[in-house]
Amino acid sequence: SHCGPLLFLLFINDINQVVRNSNILLFADDLKIYKDIRSYEDCVLLQEDIEKVGVWCETNLMEVNTKKCFIISFSRNTTAVDYQYSLFHHKVSRVSKIKDLGVMMDQKLTFTEHVQLVSCKSYKILGFINRHLKEFPIDTFKLAYISLVRSILEYNCTVWSPFYQINIKTLEGVQNKFLRICSSKLGIGHQGYQYNYQELRKVLKLDSLELRRTKNDLLFLHHLISGEIDCSSLLEKFKLRCPSRSTRNHPVFKVDFHKTNYGFFSPIARLSRLANTYNDEVELFGTSRNRFKSQLKTSKLL
């Protein structure tokens, strides 16, 4: 029914009231309970909240599939607090990686496995459309690539955008494979296995995937600032820079210092640096979505 999803959300809307010691993330019927664990006492508090959620489910006559419940600890430390959590007297399985809303996350949040997963899937789909669209025009083949392959490579990329060259090249390799196929279809010559991918992208009017991720990051930030993405808790993490005197440079956001690559390339820091870098090329504040997209297309730096 049309009202079913809405009624379900209203029905479970009070589940956050039973969780007192932890935080929750709720998307439809997908619930995540999380807490910063620093000691054994924190584990006990998290277990109490898990049990309270179990009681809430029993009270509201909702069944929980314990086989689909998992525990994962996100930490870059070599040793983490180990605790056996349970639900309805059943041990909750502990995993080292988990797929959440289409993104594969490992314990250290490197997203390397996600890159490998989406690239492998994309290669298979690219091979499929190449076999079945051999006789179709190049425009049709390009449209199929954009719709079925590139969309997989860019899904939620603002969250997991890679910064190690090995992962960047892994993703770019999928599009390069597409470009090689197009080169053959168009009769564009090449020397052995050496292809001029930059020229092929110009012919097909495509950007590199790395450049597209940069544009998607800026577009995401624009949507967040303009209110198209309604998330005040995320917006407040960006710190506006208010200098006490006039300076030559005009950075928009203040970027905190990070000692590690993980912190330096984290989404908030990365998006803040991008906004500062392209501040003179694009206008994040007071522009419509279409106007901002036009600025991205005409930017000399992008």
Model-derived segments and spans:
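Short, conserved non-catalytic motifs in the polymerase core
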Residues: 1-7, 34-39, 94, 108, ...
